[in-house]
Amino acid sequence: MPIIYYVIFAILYYLPALVANGSAPFVKNGTPIDFRKNFVDGRRLLGDGKTFEGLLVAVTFGTTVGIILAKFLGIYWIYVSFIESLLAMLGDMVGAFIKRRLGLARGARAIGLDQLDFILGATLALIISKISLNIYEFLSIVVIAFVLHILTNNVAYRLKIKSVPW
C-alpha cells in the first residue's frame, strides 16, 4: 500500500486528539487541575497550564471532530473521539508531570515529550476502542505530530497566543 494511505488513515484516526491538543492552549486563566498542589518533591504536580476549562474545551472540540467523522466512519467514532480526546489530554498531563519532576518550568522545551505525550494517550484510546493501527500509521502520526507541533507553536507564538515558540 502506498505511504499516502497510511498518512491519511493516521490523520483520520488521530484528528480528534490533534484538535483537542491544539485547542486547550486557547483557554487562559482557568482553574488548575492540580489545585496548585505540590508533589512530594516540593514542585507543582502539573502547573497552571493544565486547567479544568482547558480540558473541557479540548474534549469538547475533539469530540465534535468525532461527530463529523461519524458521518463517514460510523457512529462509533463519537465514542472513540471522546475517549481519544480525554486520554490525549491525560497524556499531555503526564507529560507536564514528568516535566515538573525534571525541574522544567511551564513552557520549557522538552523535545520529544512535548510532541508525543498526547499521541501516546490517544494511541491508548484507539487500542481500548479496538481500532487497529499498524506500525506505518503510528509512525506517520508521530512524524506528523512532531512537524505540526513545531509549526503550530510558531504560529501561536507569532499571534501572541503562546509566550514561547515551542
Swiss-Prot record:
Keywords: Cell membrane, Lipid biosynthesis, Lipid metabolism, Magnesium, Membrane, Phospholipid biosynthesis, Phospholipid metabolism, Transferase, Transmembrane, Transmembrane helix. It catalyses: 2,3-bis-O-(geranylgeranyl)-sn-glycerol 1-phosphate + CTP + H(+) = CDP-2,3-bis-O-(geranylgeranyl)-sn-glycerol + diphosphate. Pathway: Membrane lipid metabolism; glycerophospholipid metabolism. GO terms for biological process: glycerophospholipid biosynthetic process. GO terms for cellular component: plasma membrane. Its main location: membrane. It is found in: Cell membrane. Its cofactor is Mg(2+). Pfam families: CarS-like. The keyword Lipid biosynthesis applies. The keyword Cell membrane applies. Its EC number is 2.7.7.67. It is a multi-pass membrane protein. The chain crosses the membrane at residues 1-21, 55-75, 78-98, 110-130, 131-151. GO terms for molecular function: CDP-2,3-bis-(O-geranylgeranyl)-sn-glycerol synthase activity. Catalyzes the formation of CDP-2,3-bis-(O-geranylgeranyl)-sn-glycerol (CDP-archaeol) from 2,3-bis-(O-geranylgeranyl)-sn-glycerol 1-phosphate (DGGGP) and CTP. This reaction is the third ether-bond-formation step in the biosynthesis of archaeal membrane lipids. Belongs to the CDP-archaeol synthase family. This is CDP-archaeol synthase. It comes from Sulfurisphaera tokodaii (strain DSM 16993 / JCM 10545 / NBRC 100140 / 7) (Sulfolobus tokodaii). The gene is carS.
